[in-house]
Amino acid sequence: MHRNISVFTILLGFLLSACAEANTSSFSISSNGSSTLSESSNDLSSSILSSGMNESCETIVPSSSNARMSTRALETQPNQSSLESWFDETKSNKINPTIDLSTTTLTSQERVDLDLAAINYTLGMSLPSTGTNRSAFTWDSSHPDIISAKGAYINLKPGDEPVDITLTVTAKHGSITGTREFVVNVQPTPEQVLSRSDLLPFVNTSEEYLVVDQENIPVYFTDTGTIPYMDVATFMEMVDGAVDFEILTFTEEEDILTVAYTLEDEDENLEPIFYEYEAILDFELNTFSVEDFSFFGNYVKSTETDFSDGLVFLGGIGNNAELVTIPLNDYRIDLVRHNGEYMMPISILNLLFLNAIYYDVYYNGDKIYGFDTFTALDSTSPVLTEMKTSSFNLESMSLDLRQSTYHFLALAFDYFYGLKDDKNIVSFYDYLEEYADKILTGLDRNLYSGLFGFAYGLDDLHTWHEATGFYEPTSYTIPLTSLSQLGRQTQNYYQGRWAVEDLMEAAYGVNANGSPINPPALRLMDDDQIAVIFIRGFTVDTPNEVKSILCSLPETVESVVMDISYNGGGNVGAVLRLFGYMTEENIQFSSMNPVDGSAATYFYDSTYAAFDYDWYVMTSSITFSAANLMASMAKEMGVATIIGTQSSGGAASIGLFVTPDGTMLLRSTLNVFANVTVDENGNRTYTSVEPGVPVDYTLTNPFDNAAITNLINQIRSERS
């Protein structure tokens, strides 16, 4: 039923339903978030507080339960049936006021006093902006980095000193204001004690990794917490098939757990060489240490698809990594020893041990799922719906889960995001401040909205919000509906994309759905001396498709243009394999890791037979990601001449983060594509290709065959 709120307020006034409280209250917050209240300071207007209330703070109901309103409003507005029906005793939806409201009036001072008295603060609550009696609230916090002016509570680190925080609320009605203070004693996050357990099924959904479904996986919780923990070795054994569990060793020394493995290879003389990798988890100091981030990727099992078909790895050369110790304590993550086992939150196990192998674990409260990243990239996949379907879909998130998600984001992006330095971010806690209120207060959809904004706020085309978590129905999504939701760099990319599509439409027309018709896969020009091969994106099949075109070219062709002007990227392995058709020389690929400081150039031979042509790579402002890499490699190796306009970058490969609430975020990984220069002393300097690849010759319209012909003839003339 529609109700006119202003009229309703005039007619009914208000019902007093809050207990009288002191004007200043002191809280002591214990480790589990409970609070104790001690009264102090001044009583508010006792006459007002007692009106309509008994000693138990219950509403006093007048003896007449069918009191009628006598008001000119109903007499002068007889057609307002929605109002009349409230007081029609013959109708079932009538309201029986508990007070004779026709005689109740409140001054602004009384409204302010009542609304201040009615506030019942609990740690982590969203701070109200209005009172029942229409006073407007504004809040101030003495430590907004711990409790914000909207109530976002960022728990202290274990070992921190307790902090007294003063929250001051100012209420205003008309010209009258009043204040009330809450003194909150916030304690550091305590050590976690696991006291509950559950047995959950594990379901593998990946077709790339052969992981076995399992029953009765043990998961542990604190007494009142909702964060699931698992033993490290049990977790790794659960995903055997995605990881090679047999090569892993787990060495236990009191509070130290060492996870290690050894790989064997051969040198140029076919002599065996061994590479040793280890990670050290200190359960006393709550730290995770690794000497080389390649630890995370070399225990991976082979996928069903051969993404390196035709490539022979020859070795690499580069800069050594530096030891990285992650202070998990700073991110409120507690490593727990329990019954002789070494426990970590599932979300952190997934982040640390699986982030580099494109296989992830998803906990939804009822089951544990294993899936590959390619599944997450398909928003229409039934696997996503299956994983998100949970008995928690209609539940509300707990405070500890919200806090866990908040701290997870800081950890994940501080240590596993490849463009942190490019974004000039020192700590992601600084970046998160803007989103703290949404993530930590309000409805669950506030959190999902906050994570959505967090991802797109980075203005990184390789970082986006893929799916909401499991605390909402599976149908719930947050759509991108406007460019205003995106950052400046991303907006520029899409503006450039539309400009390229306009050129494409002018040359080839539009489809029935209004999208531009793509160029043909092969364009021949200049009396069949020039061939342009249009590559829309890179998939596993792209090298074979290009080979078929190359084999079909007439003998008159001298120059071949790889047109990646409308190519947004794809599979990096396909790019490397494609060079096998463009050069007989070794294929050179460089990358860098901005966290451990490592950088390397890798060399591959190809079993493919190269075609002897005058090669060109044509780019535009929307040539991105793996396509950007192709242009960079072609230029660095001297395989092709770059024509068109400068590419848009996209230096890092993409990977997935699964937050504790189940949200999926794609992001730029630590595998950052780079160019390398070597000085006279053999020192190697690596530079990210994130800014894009400058062209050798400018061509503004990649679909203008005459312009392409003229430019290539010009280049030929300059060479002769």
Language-model segment annotations:
Residues 20-22:
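Bacterial signal peptide processing site
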Residues 1-5:
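Positively charged n-region of N-terminal signal peptides that target proteins for export
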Residues 15-18:
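C-terminal motif of bacterial Sec signal peptides marking the signal peptidase cleavage site
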Residues 264-560, 564-568, 713, 717:
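Flexible, low-complexity junctional segments that flank or bridge functional domains
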Residues 375-394, 406, 530-532, 539, ...:
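C-terminal "post-core" interaction segments
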Residues 27-94, 99:
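Post-signal peptide N-terminal segment of mature Sec-exported envelope proteins
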